[in-house]
Amino acid sequence: MPAEQQRWAEIAVDAAGDAQEIVGALLLNTTGCQGYATTATTATGYLPVDERLENTLLALKSALADLPRAGLAPTVPDITIRFVAEADWANAWKQYFKPQTIGRHLVVKPTWEAWQKRPGDVVIAIDPGMAFGTGLHATTRLCLQALENHVRPGVTVADVGTGSGILAVAAALLGAAHVSATDVDPLAVRIARENVALNGVTDRVDVAEASVPPTGTFDLVVANILADVIKDMTPALFAALTPGGRLIASGIIDTRAIDVADHLAASDFADLTTSREGEWVAVEGVRSR
């Protein structure tokens, strides 16, 4: 008889608006899910159906119940559970990731989707891995648009908190002479290196397990992380820039944008500007000295 297939639980959590970032983080960190995807309204993860599932779900529900009390969500996010077979789950999350045109010329496509390249297209092929889901959050798109606006042939770029490596790859394909990508997560480092190789830019992009590049200064620093992390890392981000260099910071919910911008202004960043998509904001500033 054929072996019985492993069953998986598809856990979908409401994650709209201001709560999206924290709900996604709770789903990943509380459950350790082995597949992850997001849409504008939902965060979805996949867990094996085993003796640990019940306790894992109880822990997730408890963490979500704390969000309104902490002022992080208006109500307790709803959870929907669906069971899928082994043959289905590994590819189920991929349905959310389709080719997207971003800015004027950038196209981000998953490795499993075809794309007919048009004149002027800069095509970024990404396999984000299940740990990084679809990889095209609004903050990623904001950073990609900013890179398209500011990367010129020959510039140097640092990508702090690189994740899947998408921003580092984009900078290289847009003409950067050198890109230094860093992440404190060893899994991110591995996946980013794979995506760098996939796009043929290993000669211009290096990926290291670190919070910021340990040496050198850069014309552009992009940091798509979190508002509080950006504030904590401001001295290091400032030091990583050449005088007159530009910081592109995102991962910022709109309710925190003024706070982050004021902090950067007080830290000798000038010419501050913001861009936004939905509830998410990118803040740019220039090192003034």
What are these regions (language model features)?
Residues 130-214:
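Conserved SAM/SAH cofactor-binding pocket of Class I
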Residues 270-289:
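Core SAM-dependent methyltransferase catalytic element
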Residues 221-223:
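Hydrophobic beta-strand segment of the Class I
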Residues 231-246:
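A short glycine-rich, Lys/Arg-flanked "PGG" loop and its adjoining helix->strand segment in the class I
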Residues 8-118:
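N-terminal auxiliary segments of SAM/dcSAM-dependent transferases
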Residues 124-125, 158:
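Conserved beta-strand elements of the Class I
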Residues 244-257:
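ADP-ribose/adenylate-binding Rossmann-like module
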Residues 187-191, 229, 256:
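Conserved short alpha-helix immediately C-terminal to the canonical SAM/SAH-binding motif I
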